[in-house]
Amino acid sequence: MTGQRATPQPTLDDLPLRDDLRGKSPYGAPQLAVPVRLNTNENPHPPSRALVDDVVRSVARAAADLHRYPDRDAVQLRSDLARYLTAQTGVQLGVENLWAANGSNEILQQLLQAFGGPGRSAIGFVPSYSMHPIISDGTRTEWLQAARADDFSLDVDAAVAAVTERTPDVVFVASPNNPSGQSVSLSGLRRLLDAAPGIVIVDEAYGEFSSQPSAVQLVGEYPTKLVVTRTMSKAFAFAGGRLGYLIATPAVIEAMLLVRLPYHLSSVTQAAARAALRHADDTLGSVAALIAERERVSTALTGMGFRVIPSDANFVLFGEFTDAPASWQRYLDAGVLIRDVGIPGYLRATTGLAEENDAFLRASAQLAATELAPVNVGAIASAAEPRAAGRDHVLGAP
């Protein structure tokens, strides 16, 4: 203001922030206007005209009641989700087995509000999804971690040993894992469930791409332990809609009612998600094409000399680069945005449309000639401690 001395803007250090949050890095993924965006594992196929029209009609109907609060428990949406999952998994589910929220991250947060918190701990097997430790920190749940195998797969023996030794209240298992892409078999999950003293959260964000049966099949066997989380952001091509959900015994849904905020899912979100579910067969028809493209990309990268981690999702983790952040920048300079997930020597690329994958492979061929390194023996050990990952600052985010 004129005539007054400008007051310096306060920084984060000037605020009475919780001590355990000081020095933490927020979630971050570049959102850049580039020709090819392969960094956040979205479904590259846009919604069909029929789906868009259905969403518009559904939201218009919901808009007529915007002066009223939405269905607090999203009963119709949860019923639709139960029907979809019953058809997909063969497991008979009802509204009492489903809970929905604004993306699977809110689901994970609610789970830790209910089953984690001060004096409790959660364990994950790294490298894995970066939001697991971030949400643990936010709910003041002690974060524990154990390393994956040298190929980034889950060493079930080592995982069981870590759970047995450290007795966490919550166990996180991503299947398929992000950022490496491997799924965990039902037999492996059973061993973890048998060893775990508390809740086991199987994060199936990429479940529709997996070659393994869904962990939903085990909910009846482990009703007091198992929670399966999923999202409509990946295979469902509904990332902009922000809808996540969980499958569990009805008692877990009762626990969610204790911690959820009232009216947490807007009437617009509920209407749009229900419309998307009505077009599930059409939308999920792209999954087979994306899997075929993933395999084409993996084969081409291998032929160029890259080490490609076998994937069961809609992305591939590949290396080994002498300087992954520098290589990430070279991809960006070529108009291709991929992901530095914080694993030394490795980058991750989403499977896009055929023409997007072709552009990515052209850039990869140029980099393969100059930027590949011998096998990085220390990659796993280094990845066990999160670091500032080039431009992303996270491990294995969406």
UniProtKB/Swiss-Prot annotation:
Arranged from A to Z, the UniProt key words for this protein are: Amino-acid biosynthesis, Aminotransferase, Histidine biosynthesis, Pyridoxal phosphate, Transferase
Catalysed reaction(s)? L-histidinol phosphate + 2-oxoglutarate = 3-(imidazol-4-yl)-2-oxopropyl phosphate + L-glutamate
What GO annotations for molecular function exist for this entry?
histidinol-phosphate transaminase activity; pyridoxal phosphate binding
What CDD domains has UniProt attached to this entry?
A: AAT_like (cd00609)
Q: What positions are modified (N6-(pyridoxal phosphate)lysine)?
A: 234
**Name of the protein described by the UniProt record:** Histidinol-phosphate aminotransferase
Mark out the compositionally biased spans (Polar residues).
1-10
**GO biological process terms held by the UniProt record:** L-histidine biosynthetic process
Describe its partners and assembly state: Homodimer.
Q: Which cofactor does it need?
A: pyridoxal 5'-phosphate
Tell me the pathway. Amino-acid biosynthesis; L-histidine biosynthesis; L-histidine from 5-phospho-alpha-D-ribose 1-diphosphate: step 7/9
Organism domain of life? Bacteria
Which EC numbers characterise this protein's activity in its record? 2.6.1.9
Supply the PROSITE patterns for this chain. AA_TRANSFER_CLASS_2
Q: Coiled-coil intervals in this record?
A: none
Which Gene3D superfamilies does the protein's record reference? Answer: Aspartate Aminotransferase, domain 1, Type I PLP-dependent aspartate aminotransferase-like (Major domain)
EC class name:
transferase
